[in-house]
């Protein structure tokens, strides 16, 4: 939300289509198109990295530098020109520089009055003065109400990411638990995106990991299936999940329709907040079975009760008087801000997440929080209650905007006493601790980058490191990968994979694969640089041009990489480093290679060597994961016969023994050898297929 800059306040907030016309345009307040829904089978889903790991501290610009009078006068003149044409009604304005980049998006109840405040010759903080000095054009969009202006502002800020606004970063849709309603035997699964599939949705959860853990525990407690409908319909006998008591087996009639319906009802009741009643029901059934000497049945109820207790122990605090709320607390230190968000639904804690919005130092906690909230709910349904650690300006206006989006009442408050105040205080403690950890991690990373620069003789610590690796099995499903690291650690939204396209490659020709990957990466980057685009940072302030490129390999791989850069005329602009594994692939005995320099050997306990190992291992993890996805696709299309020596009879034996392809992949070498008809050699072949070594 926007505040008068004369009072040294700025803002952010709202939705809708952009327009290039500076003339007043009344936007249609239509909701964002919902992202494609993603239903994920928990029996086959891979556990992902916690979303919070991707949250990085933004770069904070120095806002104390003086601004020259000349540029200020030019900027004020451009704004004065816009004031003459500006309406006195509500609307949104955008300030643009000479390159037509949007510097700032703001909203106002009276656009003419707001813009006039920028045209004053004095009284601006340095942040506002720098923005005015860079402004050459102002564009205005009129709206019917101030509420519409707030919504539009938030949407445009998220879409355009202006330099002088508070920016919500690392924003993703949150996962939900879905119990489907379009099949006689409902399925429990993880879901993101539009809630268009029939069924009951429970959430949001703060992370995919929290959803995975909850679904696993719910399967143990309520034995609800997680398999896809097609897998369900094809079963002739129960799968492994039935054998390990994580499914009741409705596919093959191990449980009848009324019995399964009761299990689903109990699961829904538990997720709806009636956990005490569900646990009492299970306890009664357990005691009844025990009294009737049905000890195996009693043990099953005991295990189900234990699974429910495990879920509740993971949830931490569960409020007594708050049924549905999001709790926001902001903490600032060292010019950085951390907003901690807790999600409470049906009286249960569905987790929390830390955000590190980009905001210049002069923004107050109230200003950052107000702008953060408008952007946060731009594409998410708000709960009935929103609790805040700080009072924000235009709180009633934001509540009205969220009421319009939700089509029901939404209350925003800053509690002063009671349990709600305790929830906010708990969130504030988490915000302070999260920012403290992030600042400490950043300081450690800075020291490591400085040490790396000293070891390699670099002129300054690298701001962007790219690490490359490739993976294949005898040349099949060959894939290359790039991971990126910088002052804040791994930058996962910058990772890239490269499916090898070259035909006629000799199986196992790692040099040729690396050449293709680097050619594709640096041809694109060189073209962007020639057009003046590569020097621009992306939305996360990460430079696009690498200071250091690390290749997983020795002198040969290094020379192949150098050859590519030489052909592109970039060899003088990119520093290359090859990392060769030690004898017997021992960690700590690596050798480092750089062009036209002697090999470098570091002490096994050198922190710089450990840092390089972490970079290489992360590239290896990512490329192996990409390779496995390609292999799984082939397996889905061709079946287990894709594995050399595995025909239809052995495929049937494996599926009969393990139940699912996922369980075959998870099986140890010893477990594979126990399958009738699978020899030790075949077991080794199957195991190696699912667990390949590096490139």
Curated annotation (Swiss-Prot):
An example Gene Ontology molecular-function term: excinuclease ABC activity
Gene3D superfamilies xref list: 5' to 3' exonuclease, C-terminal subdomain, GIY-YIG endonuclease, UVR domain, UvrC, RNAse H endonuclease domain
Residue ranges with Basic and acidic residues bias: 1-10
InterPro entries on file: GIY-YIG_endonuc (IPR000305), GIY-YIG_endonuc_sf (IPR035901), GIY-YIG_UvrC_Cho (IPR047296), Hlx-hairpin-Hlx_DNA-bd_motif (IPR003583), RuvA_2-like (IPR010994), UVR_dom (IPR001943), UVR_dom_sf (IPR036876), UvrABC_protein_C (IPR050066)
Domain UVR: start-end pairs: 276-311
Subunit annotation: Interacts with UvrB in an incision complex.
Entry-linked NCBIfam families: PRK00558.1-5, uvrC
Annotated family: Belongs to the UvrC family.
Function statement: The UvrABC repair system catalyzes the recognition and processing of DNA lesions. UvrC both incises the 5' and 3' sides of the lesion. The N-terminal half is responsible for the 3' incision and the C-terminal half is responsible for the 5' incision.
PANTHER family: UVRABC SYSTEM PROTEIN C, UVRC/OXIDOREDUCTASE
Protein name: UvrABC system protein C
Encoding gene (name): uvrC
């Amino acid at each position: 939300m926007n505040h008068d800059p004369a009072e040294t306040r700025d803002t952010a907030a709202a939705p809708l289509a952009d327009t290039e016309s500076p003339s007043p345009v009344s936007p249609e307040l239509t909701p964002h198109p919902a992202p494609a829904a993603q239903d994920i089978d928990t029996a086959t889903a891979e556990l992902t990295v916690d979303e919070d790991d991707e949250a990085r501290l933004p770069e904070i610009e120095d806002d104390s530098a003086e601004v020259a009078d000349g540029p200020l006068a030019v900027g004020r003149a451009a704004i004065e020109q816009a004031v003459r044409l500006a309406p006195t009604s509500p609307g949104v304005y955008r300030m643009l520089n000479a390159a037509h980049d949007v510097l700032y998006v703001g909203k106002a109840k009276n656009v003419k009055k707001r813009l006039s405040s920028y045209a004053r010759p004095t009284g601006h903080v340095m942040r506002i003065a720098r923005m005015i000095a860079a402004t050459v054009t102002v564009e205005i969009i009129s709206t019917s109400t101030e509420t519409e202006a707030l919504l539009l502002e938030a949407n445009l800020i998220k879409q355009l990411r202006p330099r002088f606004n508070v920016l919500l970063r690392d924003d993703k849709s949150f996962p939900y638990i879905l119990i489907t309603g379009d099949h006689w035997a409902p399925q429990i699964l993880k879901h993101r995106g539009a809630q268009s599939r029939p069924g009951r949705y429970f959430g949001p959860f703060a992370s995919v990991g929290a959803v995975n853990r909850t679904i696993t525990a719910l399967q143990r407690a309520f034995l609800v299936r997680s398999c896809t409908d097609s897998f369900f319909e094809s079963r002739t006998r129960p799968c492994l999940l039935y054998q390990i008591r994580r499914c009741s087996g409705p596919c093959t009639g191990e449980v009848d329709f009324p019995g399964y319906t009761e299990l689903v009802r109990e699961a829904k009741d538990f997720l709806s907040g009636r956990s005490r009643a569900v646990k009492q029901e299970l306890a009664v059934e357990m005691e009844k079975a025990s009294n009737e000497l049905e000890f195996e049945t009693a043990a099953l109820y005991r295990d189900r009760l234990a699974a429910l207790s495990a879920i509740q122990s993971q949830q931490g605090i569960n409020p007594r008087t708050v049924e549905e709320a999001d709790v926001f607390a902001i903490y600032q230190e060292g010019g950085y801000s951390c907003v901690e968000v807790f999600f409470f639904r049906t009286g249960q804690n569905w987790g929390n997440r830390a955000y590190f919005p980009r905001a210049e130092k002069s923004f107050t906690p109230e200003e950052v929080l107000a702008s953060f909230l408008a952007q946060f709910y731009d594409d998410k349904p708000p709960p009935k209650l929103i609790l805040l650690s700080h009072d924000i300006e235009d709180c009633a206006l934001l509540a009205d905007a969220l009421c319009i989006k939700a089509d029901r009442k939404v209350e925003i408050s800053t509690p002063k006493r009671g349990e709600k105040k305790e929830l906010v205080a708990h969130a504030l403690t988490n915000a302070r601790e999260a920012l403290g950890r992030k600042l400490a991690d950043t300081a450690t990373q800075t020291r490591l980058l400085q040490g790396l620069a000293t070891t390699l003789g670099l002129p300054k610590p690298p701001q962007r490191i790219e690490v490359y690796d490739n993976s294949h099995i005898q040349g099949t499903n060959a894939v290359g990968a790039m991971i990126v690291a910088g002052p804040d650690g791994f930058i996962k939204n910058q990772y890239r994979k490269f499916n090898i396209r070259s035909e006629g490659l000799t199986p196992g020709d790692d040099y040729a694969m690396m050449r293709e990957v680097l050619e594709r990466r640096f041809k694109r980057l060189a073209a962007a640089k020639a057009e003046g685009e590569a020097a621009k940072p992306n939305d996360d302030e990460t430079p696009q041009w690498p200071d250091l490129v690390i290749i997983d390999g020795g002198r040969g791989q290094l020379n192949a990489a150098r050859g590519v850069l030489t052909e592109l005329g970039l060899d003088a602009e990119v520093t290359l480093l090859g990392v060769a594994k030690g004898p017997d692939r021992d960690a700590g005995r690596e050798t480092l290679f750089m062009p036209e320099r002697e090999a470098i050997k570091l002490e096994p306990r050198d922190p710089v060597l450990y840092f390089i190992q972490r970079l290489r291992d992360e590239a290896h993890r990512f490329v192996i994961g990409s390779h496995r996805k390609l292999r799984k696709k082939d397996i889905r299309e061709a079946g287990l016969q894709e594995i050399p020596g595995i025909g239809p009879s052995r495929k049937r034996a494996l599926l009969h023994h393990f139940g699912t392809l996922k369980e075959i992949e998870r099986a140890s070498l010893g477990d594979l050898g126990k399958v009738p008809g699978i020899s030790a050699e075949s077991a080794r072949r199957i195991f190696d297929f699912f667990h390949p070594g590096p490139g």
